[in-house]
């Protein structure tokens, strides 16, 4: 892809991206590192060309296979929660999708491991991420509900689809001191923060309800 396509022209220009960042700030995103990450990633390359003029609007867009690219606000919000004002080491993302959230995470993390169950989506995401030359990302075609136990523990886990309940398999892969952000629910969904806290007798998980959200469902298996 040409440098012009990556930087964007017209509706996909840097100026349009900056307007998106101002809107995110107005909606309460305070972490400058997160805002810089969203400003550095060209969202328009992750959507179909026919939708590129809407890439920097604060809304989700279809990416095929019944999946969507999350609205910029929720990408920023979940990244801000996961970061918690500090650097991130090893992060697991469940649901690569088109790769946009993955790319944002790569800007605020040392390592990002991302799992996607739909192979064609994964292949498309891999192409986008290669264009951006992001070297700290590893993608895997696998059942995201199982995580990546062979690479655990993770300092942060982000789930980008709504689970019926918080999977025990993912809890067990969260490092002590780590944080997981996950939407939970079916018709009504709530974004949860799960913290793995050290205690005098070992460790415990603390769950906090954050806000209402709307995601595609988290499904098991692969295709």
Swiss-Prot record:
The keyword Methyltransferase applies. Keywords: Cytoplasm, Methyltransferase, S-adenosyl-L-methionine, Transferase. The keyword Transferase applies. It is found in: Cytoplasm. The active site is at residue 70. It comes from the Bacteria. One of its GO terms (cellular component) is cytoplasm. Gene3D superfamilies: Vaccinia Virus protein VP39. Disulfide bonds: none annotated. One of its GO terms (biological process) is protein modification process. Its main location: cytoplasm. It catalyses: [protein]-L-isoaspartate + S-adenosyl-L-methionine = [protein]-L-isoaspartate alpha-methyl ester + S-adenosyl-L-homocysteine. PROSITE patterns: PCMT (PS01279). It holds the Pfam family PCMT. GO terms for molecular function: protein-L-isoaspartate (D-aspartate) O-methyltransferase activity. CDD domains: AdoMet_MTases. Coiled coil: none annotated. Its EC number is 2.1.1.77. PANTHER family: PROTEIN-L-ISOASPARTATE O-METHYLTRANSFERASE, PROTEIN-L-ISOASPARTATE(D-ASPARTATE) O-METHYLTRANSFERASE. Catalyzes the methyl esterification of L-isoaspartyl residues in peptides and proteins that result from spontaneous decomposition of normal L-aspartyl and L-asparaginyl residues. It plays a role in the repair and/or degradation of damaged proteins. Belongs to the methyltransferase superfamily. L-isoaspartyl/D-aspartyl protein methyltransferase family. This is Protein-L-isoaspartate O-methyltransferase.
């Amino acid at each position: 892809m040409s440098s012009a396509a990556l930087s964007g022209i017209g509706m996909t220009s840097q100026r349009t991206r900056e307007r998106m960042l101002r809107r995110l700030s107005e909606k309460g995103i305070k972490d400058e590192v997160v805002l810089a990450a969203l400003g550095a990633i060209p969202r328009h390359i992750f959507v179909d060309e026919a939708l590129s003029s809407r890439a920097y609007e604060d809304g989700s867009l279809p990416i095929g296979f019944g999946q969507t690219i999350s609205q910029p606000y929720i990408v920023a919000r979940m990244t801000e929660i996961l970061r918690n004002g500090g650097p991130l080491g090893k992060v697991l993302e469940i649901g690569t999708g088109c790769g946009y959230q993955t790319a944002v995470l790569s800007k605020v993390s040392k390592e990002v491991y991302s799992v996607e169950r739909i192979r064609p989506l994964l292949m498309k995401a891999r192409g986008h991420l290669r264009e951006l030359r992001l070297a700290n990302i590893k993608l895997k075609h696998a059942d995201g509900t199982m995580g990546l136990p062979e690479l655990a523990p993770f300092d942060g886990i982000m789930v980008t689809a709504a689970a019926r309940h918080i999977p025990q398999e993912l809890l067990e892969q969260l490092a002590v001191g780590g944080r997981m952000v996950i939407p939970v629910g079916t018709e009504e969904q709530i974004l949860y923060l799960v913290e793995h806290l050290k205690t005098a007798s070992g460790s415990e998980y603390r769950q906090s309800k954050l806000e209402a959200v709307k995601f595609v469902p988290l499904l098991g298996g692969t295709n």
